[in-house]
Amino acid sequence: MASSDDIRGLRPPIAAAYDKTRRTVLEGGIVDQAIKDLCARYLAVDDEVVAHSDDPARFDERERAALAWTHAVAWDDTKADDDLWARLHVSFTEPELVELGYFIAFTLGQQHWLATLGAPGAPGPPR
C-alpha cells in the first residue's frame, strides 16, 4: 500500500492543505501536543489509554476531560452533555476547544479514510 502522503500527493492541493493542517493543528497550535497524542491514542483504541481513560491515578482532570470528549466525538455524542462541557471549560479556553475538537475530528476521519484504503489497524469503538 502506498503511504498516506503518496495518496494525498495524487492531488497536490489536497497534499498542500494536509501539510498546512499538519503544521498548524496536528503538530502545532496552542493545545499541548501530549494531550493531542493522548486523544489520538484513544481514537486508535490503544488499550492502555481506553481502559484507564477516567482513572485519576493515570490521567489528570484535563487529560480525562479531553478523553471524555474524544469518546463523545467518536462514538457517543450523547456524552457531550452539560457536565462534560463544564469540565472542558474548566480545563481549556474556547480557542483550545476549537483546536482540540478539530484535531479529534480530523484524526478520526483520517484513521477511517486510511482504513478504507487498506491501512492496517482500523479503529473501532472501545471495548
Residue ranges and their predicted role:
Residues 1-127:
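Hydrophobic alpha-helical segments
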